[in-house]
Amino acid sequence: MRDLKHVFVMTYGRSGSTLLMGILNSIPGWLLRGENRHAMRHLYDFHHSGMAEKARVDPDRASQPTHPWFGIDGYPEVASLQHIRALAEATLLRPAPDTRVSGYKEIRWYDQDLPDYLAFLQQVFPGCRFVLNTRNLADVAASNYWTHKDDPLGQVQRIEERMLSAAEGLGDAVHRVHYDDYVADPEVLRGLFSWLGEVYDQNRIHEVLATPHSRPAKHRAGDLSL
């Protein structure tokens, strides 16, 4: 398995995260993918189920072929995490030969057990870091991604509060940026680049900012309403 660094962008819909992804992907050796509809969450549920049932059963009894949960006592935590990482890198991340930093941005960080999910990602991708992107919530709620939902401003407020609360447990593994700030003055991104250990290239950043990103949102069935 390659010695890659991993960075994940945490945000919500219509926060300007596609632009942020473009900024980060302008760094040589970076390859962050876009959204995957929270696909890693399914792997978290898989792993969490295996670990929970392993802890629940009596290992002496569950190791017997006459037990209804025969074999779950041997659920291999380390192997599971290794295979989950291999699957994610082979399917979702697909790093190029020259990729140094891999990851993705996602807008679906609204689960009640978000701190546990983040801890899982840290197990799967040791040393991974998170960039938490926020935006003026009134502007977010007014976008067509949210206006068809019940209480759009209340929803994005609750999502942001949950992300910020979970981020408190990440310590130095998370860095927050605010869309309105870096669009008004890209120089504020120097702090992010310093935290990442990357060179801030002013010309490259301005080229990205001058390039249109994203597109008008379409209403999608299945997006969670909070």
Predicted features by range, described:
Residues 45, 50-58, 95-202:
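PAPS-dependent sulfotransferase catalytic domain
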Residues 1, 90-96:
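Short boundary motifs at domain starts and secondary-structure transition points
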Residues 80-92, 165, 169:
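Catalytic alpha-helical scaffold of carbohydrate-active enzymes acting on polysaccharides/glycoconjugates
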Residues 1-87, 202-204, 208-226:
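PAPS-dependent sulfotransferase catalytic core
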